[in-house]
Amino acid sequence: FLSGGIDSTANVALMSRMMSEPVKTFTVGFRDNPVYNELDEARQVAREYGTDHHEVIISQQDLLDSLPEIIFHQDEPNADPVCVPLLHVSKLAKETGTTVVQVGEGSDELFCGYRDYVSYLNLYNRGWRQLTGLPHFIRKAISATGLGAFQLGAGQLFPKARKMAPDLFRRLAQGEELFWSGAFVFDEVYKSHLFSAATLERLAARNSGRRLSSYSVVQSDLERLLAARPEADQLQRMIYLDLKLRLPELLLMRVDKVTMAASIEARVPFLDHKLVEFAMNIPSGLKYRNGQKKYILHRALQGHIPDWVLKRKKKGFGAPINEWMLQRLGGMIDHELFNSSLRGRQLFDYGFIRQIVEQQRRGQVNNSFFLWALLNLSLWYDHWIEGQPSLSWASGARAAVDEENARLQLAGQGGSRLV
């Protein structure tokens, strides 16, 4: 799979040297959302190495049509919209007779390739580290009064952190780790609004009256790291947590299940155990230096891949889920969330869910990632737990969704048109 970024280009460059025939490369793009595309960069790399290049361009309709298949093959709820383009590019590969593909998962974790790593590092170094050294009662007071925002500096709270600022201050007061890995969708403060009062009471009762928190998962992995390597710095902690949580439970699970749904196998050369062992012993200062992410990987690949690839800004493999939710997917969200059998279990506060749906519809707040997670959970529950024949979206709900879109448009509730 080729994006034209450093990881996939390195794969193609090395494979080209070892193969007597052209490497087959595959790229996916979005018809109505070119800002997400890396088609031009992939084509340029394909020309550079003379690959047998293939492309697939998908639309929002392709998303709607493929959702039942994705829910079926994932087996469990999955909150990652990248499954959609991944399924289509996997099918493209299969159509060419390909049975095994090389992918770039693992490189960002091993060599500090994520923008969030840098953002969390800046937040840690410019305030968090100093605040965590204060006595508990002072940290609690700072968090409760909002002084934490002043101490950390509003400008230092990158977009994701601004959104989860209440939970960051809660973590500060409780002495919890700043970074919990990228595998979590809902933070603890958000969950206190999302779950119904009855659910929160049941969870507390099962946990001896104490609040049940996802931090228990983070804490156990972190304690294991610090027992083996007490000198681990902040970047090493973040990388370790992602290797233990996000990579295996989200990224590798995603790529394995979705590619196998198309009857192909994905292999991850960056996760060769010898390379992982080597990379984990590289000092943090060689992974992130002078504002350069993946510093040592860039140095190692100089002269092996084109300079323009090394210099281009990382885009990342994404999907225009926010834009799609401002269009026809918005009607599907409205229909499926509030008509799912899951609603009858009273796990969630659907008044709160209605609020975030309305915020998304009006374009006030980008709640797309949260809503995508809830949509997938609802569809998964209906299919696998309730045993409903196929999914309602695939078996007759389209007319209801179209009607809902038309109603919302006539109601003039702001935001983009949902058609």
State where each predicted segment sits.
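Residue-level signal for inorganic ion chemistry
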Residues: 46, 104, 272
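A mobile, often basic/glycine-rich helix-loop segment
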Residues: 110-140
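Adenosyl-5′-phosphate
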Residues: 51, 82, 91, 95-100, ...
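Short, polar/flexible loop-turn hinges at active-site or ligand-entry regions and domain interfaces
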Residues: 75-79, 125-129, 285-289
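ATP-dependent adenylation/pyrophosphate-handling site
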Residues: 1-52
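Short acidic/histidine-rich active-site segments
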Residues: 98-114
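Short beta-strand segments
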Residues: 1-3, 26-29, 55-57, 102-105, ...
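A conserved beta-strand->alpha-helix junction
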Residues: 24, 38-73, 92, 212-224
